[in-house]
Each structure stands twice: as C-alpha cells, then as structure tokens.
C-alpha cells in the first residue's frame, strides 16, 4: 500500500509515522508531505530516511491512501484533489466532520458505518474520541439521558506553538509567538478554540455535535466546558452521566472492563486512577473515579484520560485505515 502523510513533520503527523511503524499494515511506499519550508527534510520510517515532499507532487503520484493532519484549510483544498486521482483520504481536521455526506468514525464505536465507497473519512476531535468510547458502552448498558463534561486539555492539542509557549514560560524565556491569550504555565485557561455567539467555544461545540453524530443520537443532551492546562500530553475529562435507569457500579466497571480499547483504572484507596502522565504513549482510553452521583438519581461521575496525539488523533486515523483494509483491501 502506498501511503501519504500530509503534515508529516507536525506533532500529530510525526506520531502517525510512529503508529504506522508499530502496526502490521503493509507500507510499500511512504510519502511524507510537509510545508514548503519542510520540503527536502528527512523523516525516519522503519529505519530509513525518507524525504519530505510537497503536496502537489504527491497528488501526482496517486497514493492509495492519504492521512491528513495539516489543518482544515489544507484539507478542504487538497483532499478533493487526492480523491480525484483515486486516493482515499482520512482527515484529522474539522473540515469534513459535520458534513452530512462524510463518515465521522471511531472504529470501536461506529466502525460499521464505513463502506468501500467512502472516499473521505473524518477523524473526530481528540476530546470527542475518548468520550464516545465510554459513552457508547454505557448507552448500550443503561441508556444515556444527559451528559455534562469538563475537559482538561494538554498543550499538544494546540500544536507545536502551544508546546513552545509552555516550554518558554517554564524556562523563563520570552514567548516569541503565543498560542494562548494568557500565560499557560501555572495556569488554567477556559478557552479552547474561538468563542461563538452562544458563549461556548468551538471546541465545546465539537464535543456536542460530533458525539451525537458518532453515537447515532442526533438529539443527544450533552453540555461541555473545555479548559487548557499546562500539561504536555494527555487530555482528561470529568464526566457526569444521567441514565434512563438506575446504574450499578459493578455492572458499569464490568461493561467498561470488557470493552475493546478501554482500560479501567479505578482503585482510589491505592491511589490508582487515570492520569495524563500514565496514559502518555499508550493507545487505550483510561477510565476511573467511577462513583454514583449522590445529588441526583440514575447518575454517575467518572474520569476519562487518553493520549490526545495517539488515540485522540494518529492511532484512531490508522485504525480507520486498518478497518478500510478489512472491508476493501488495497493491494499496491
């Protein structure tokens, strides 16, 4: 299989290369794509140096699959051009997620919706992926009535600029290009992406809209608050879920414990619960602090953590590719 990675020198793109290396997909040719400033640079893939190419050149090479992680503007411009030459596109940006004609996929949740005819498949927002992994299991078990989620998101969710700002502030250096309107070190900023007229941010509304689409519940009652925190990798979520029937904690732990891609870490008496530092570089979604909400009936609180660069982005995209291969093998 001939695979292009658009944005290969960025945070998510570089992790995509790692994930492709780790998994058993056959990669006959790799085309790393970067900005004009990156063309000619080398990236490592399976022990070899591979030159970064320009996107127009790679379109002409007609790869079998293109994994996009270069922002919505790049995806809107170039994804259709790849499709026109027969390439299947898996896009990590927000460009196509809410397009009625495009699938928005988390393989463990709604992988069944993929078909061999899909040409552009959208990869959900990082915070959405880890949330719906858990919501899907609990909706099957108890029926979800309402969800309240607060997210605590690492600076890698903003890209290299966010990482540089945090590192500069921690090192006492001047910030030459700020990713945030306020200092991020020793701070929490309740401002992820732009604010909308309804008072929510785009990030918060992504959680609302994408979750409903993925779960097949267009009228899902979900409200969100998203906060940027001074952590390098890993998004955390405090989630309150109201169910249609009375939950039992043991059945919740059992259901989540059996779910593919979910790891239950819930032993607070021994200080065991999910944390960004223990989820980094792992593909699982970690769940803990599972407890009844004593303020209202039929409700639980829980805590979800995942590596936003892996399951929240790169790994999920590669899993979509693997699922496409199962449904319609691509043989170069």
What does each of the following model-derived ranges do?
Residues 66, 155-332:
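Charged docking surfaces used in two-component/phosphorelay signaling
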Residues 1-184, 219-221, 285-286, 290-296, ...:
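N-terminal Rossmann-like NAD(P) cofactor-binding subdomain of oxidoreductases
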């Amino acid at each position: 299989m001939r695979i292009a990675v658009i944005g290969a020198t960025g945070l998510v793109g570089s992790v995509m290369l790692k994930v492709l290396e780790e998994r058993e997909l056959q990669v006959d040719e790799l085309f790393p794509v970067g900005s004009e400033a990156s063309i000619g640079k080398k990236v490592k893939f399976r022990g070899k140096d591979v030159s970064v190419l320009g996107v127009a050149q790679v379109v002409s090479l007609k790869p079998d699959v293109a994994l996009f992680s270069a922002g919505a503007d790049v995806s809107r411009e170039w994804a259709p051009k790849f499709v026109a030459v027969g390439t299947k596109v898996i896009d990590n940006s927000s460009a196509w997620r809410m397009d009625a004609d495009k699938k928005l996929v988390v393989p463990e949740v709604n992988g069944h919706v993929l078909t061999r005819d899909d040409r552009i498949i959208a990869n959900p927002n990082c915070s959405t992926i880890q949330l719906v992994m858990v919501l899907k299991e609990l909706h099957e078990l108890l029926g979800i009535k309402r969800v309240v989620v607060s997210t605590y998101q690492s600076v890698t969710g903003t890209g290299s600029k966010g990482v540089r700002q945090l590192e500069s502030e921690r090192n006492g250096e001047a910030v030459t290009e700020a990713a945030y309107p306020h200092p991020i070190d020793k701070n929490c900023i309740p401002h992820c992406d732009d604010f909308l007229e309804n008072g929510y941010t785009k990030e918060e509304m992504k959680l609302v809209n994408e979750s409903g689409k993925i779960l097949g519940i267009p009228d899902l009652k979900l409200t969100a608050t998203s906060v940027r925190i001074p952590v390098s990798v890993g998004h955390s979520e405090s989630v309150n879920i109201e169910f249609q029937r009375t939950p039992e904690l043991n059945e919740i732990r059992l259901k989540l414990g059996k779910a593919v891609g979910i790891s239950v870490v819930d032993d607070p008496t021994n200080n065991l619960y999910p944390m960004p530092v223990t989820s980094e570089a792992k593909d699982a979604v970690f769940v803990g602090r599972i407890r009844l909400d004593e303020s209202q009936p039929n409700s639980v609180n829980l805590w979800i953590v995942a590596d936003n660069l892996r399951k929240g982005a790169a790994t999920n995209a590669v899993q979509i590719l693997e699922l496409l291969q199962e449904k319609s093998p691509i043989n170069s």
